[in-house]
Design a protein with these regions (language model features):
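Short, acidic/turn-prone active-site loops that include or flank metal/cofactor-
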Residues: 11, 69-75, 232-234
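Conserved alpha/beta core of the MobA/IspD/sugar-nucleotide pyrophosphorylase nucleotidyltransferase superfamily
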Residues: 172-255
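Conserved core of the sugar-phosphate nucleotidyltransferase
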Residues: 106-205
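Short phosphate-binding loop-to-helix
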Residues: 46, 52-114
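A conserved hydrophobic position in a structured secondary element of the catalytic/binding core
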Residues: 49-50, 104, 191, 239
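N-terminal glycine-rich phosphate-binding loop and ensuing alpha1 helix
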Residues: 2-49
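Short, structured coil segments at secondary-structure junctions
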Residues: 41, 61-62, 149
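Short, high-confidence coil segments that cap the C-terminus of an alpha-helix
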Residues: 42, 90-91, 119-122, 223
């Protein structure tokens, strides 16, 4: 199986500006994401960015990077620009590793690429893990996913879905069945180039605009997304200063 990892990275994050260049135990965040991606089975790893600062940092640590337009609506749009510049064939698989996932396990990258390669009838593959506490369930920054019995996505949302009416009473956990836990979406994707090209041709979907979740554009226009349980725990990415501090603590503890 052949696949490419592309890492979209923006400097102007609304919640934590400049986070790709923030230091985590002596390395910038983007270098850590790149290093984790290189441990996967990918043929090539490249950073897609509209920031000269990020571009220069990647070149400095010996990585590959590509400058992109600053007008993209999403990381997927940015990724498609680079895939087009690389002239990758329509059936080639690209894995989108977010630029704020410094602890992304290479096993998760390999898993999502393999899942897509094994399924010709779907255009996108991604991962989930169970949510075991109420705080994460109601957190709008924790994206939830609902799937059908074939492992295909029915819905992605920042809202607490599916709402377990009998398990949660007056905003308190009455009980949560271990066999029916809600699912946290893990923001890693595998696509075929042909699917990426379709994505950028579609207008932004109404639901995508409401939730600010670009994967909803695929579903809005009828593309199927396969969602599998991650074979390994995937730490949450860095959206806030608190997330950054948590990652630093985790790395320090494991030294």
């Amino acid at each position: 199986m052949s696949f490419t990892v592309i890492i979209p990275a923006r400097f102007d994050s609304s919640r934590l500006p400049g986070k790709p260049l923030m230091k985590i135990s002596g390395m910038t965040m983007i270098e850590r994401v790149y290093a984790q991606s290189k441990k996967s089975h990918a043929d090539r790893v490249i950073v897609a960015t509209d920031s000269k600062k990020i571009f220069d940092e990647v070149i400095l640590f010996g990585g590959q990077a590509c400058m992109t337009s600053s007008h993209h609506q999403s990381g997927t749009d940015r990724l498609q620009e680079v895939a087009k510049l690389l002239d990758l064939p329509p059936k080639h698989i690209v894995v989108n590793v977010q630029g704020d996932e410094p602890l992304i396990p290479p096993e998760a990258i390999n898993q999502v690429a393999s899942n897509l390669a094994a399924r010709d009838s779907v255009g996108v593959a991604t991962l989930f893990e169970p949510i075991g506490n109420y705080e994460d369930f109601i957190d709008k920054n924790v994206v939830k996913v609902v799937i059908d019995n074939a492992g295909l996505a029915l819905l992605f949302s920042r809202a607490p879905v599916p709402w377990p009416r009998e398990d949660i009473i007056d905003n308190k956990v009455n009980r949560i069945s271990v066999t029916d836990l809600p699912m946290r979406h893990i923001g890693i994707y595998a696509y075929r180039i042909s699917t990426l090209n379709q994505f950028v041709s579609w207008p932004i979907a109404t639901l995508e605009r409401k939730e600010l979740l670009e994967q909803l554009r695929f579903m809005w226009y009828g593309e199927r997304i396969h969602v599998d349980k991650a074979v390994i725990e995937v730490p949450r990415g860095v959206d806030t200063k608190e997330d950054l501090e948590d990652v630093i603590k985790l790395l320090t503890t494991n030294l």
